[in-house]
Amino acid sequence: MPEFEIQHTTRYIYEGTVRDSANQVILYPIVDDYQEVIRQEVTITGNPDVDVHTDYFGNQIGSFTYTDPHNVMVINSRVLVTTKHRTLPVNDIFPSHQWEDLKRLQTIVPYIDFLKQEYFEGLDELQEVVNKERNSDDTPYQIVLRFCQYVFDNFEYIKGVTTVDTKLDQIWKMKQGVCQDFAHILIEMLRILQIPARYVSGYICTNSNGMRGEGATHAWVEAFIPDYGWLGIDPTNNCIANDTHVRLAVGRNFSDCSPVKGVYKGSSNHKLSVTVSVDQESLPPGQHQVIEVPIADQVTEFTKNSYQRYMEMIQMQQQQQQQQQEKQLQQ
């Protein structure tokens, strides 16, 4: 049974002194029959109290506020987790029966959120691709594998061309991006055929080189297969997400699973850097591989924070209202 020690460090460097930093962290690995947390330590600059609760999707969410003036904030998670290999779906059930089972899920609350499509300009083109790639006698499992292959073959893995805010329109047009972009496209394809699909954030932990996303935060997809449950599928690497994938959170998209996000008061600009290291504990003595990779596409130069953008928006609205009032008085 694989055992991984993972260290995930998030560092904010502010252009000036800030305060009242309110943050949400999703750094607590999922615990279920196939994944177990042996121990975990989360440390944060200023040692604020962290309130941990479970969200709608079953993820463990930590919330904290750091009120003291500061110009640097570091959030560090160190966790030891074990994973268990899961057998693959048995593909011997009549396809028609499986598709009927999926139809029944369309009105069941836990699955509705994972069936909603996101409209974008290229949706009609994607619909054509889905129809072309699908065979009439395919099972949902076969569809998942084929669509995963399609994304892997037709999208180019390039860091830096997209951000977490990049829309499906841009991803579809460029046919380029990183793991979260590959995941979002595959999710949309599966939902077109009413296969429940959800976004997964976590880590990919292997002792061999060549896997995209290795040693860094990663994203993939889980698709619901009748008589099996949620199947992890990684379109970035065209593989089943099994015991080398450590899950942090699941949701409708990246926004539901962002490892760290928050707002603050003060200087409007900041710089963010993220590093992840993975040590595979199950390797024989002397053969431990520690991979430390700065996530280039998650490093942003000084940019305005959401609190500042919100205040600017409010100020703009007030100015517009004032101008309208002045015009009315002049009339």
Task: Label each residue range with its predicted role.
Residues V25-L27, E41-V42, N59, N91-E100, ...:
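Short intrinsically disordered coil segments
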Residues D279-Q331:
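Alpha-helical and coiled-coil interaction segments, frequently adjacent to or embedded
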Residues T83, D101, L105-G177, I185, ...:
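Secondary-structure boundary elements
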Residues P2, H8, S21-N23, Q40, ...:
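Structural beta-strand/beta-sheet cores of well-ordered domains, especially the beta-sheet scaffolds
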Residues Q149, D181-S268:
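Hydrophobic/aromatic-rich core segments of domains that either
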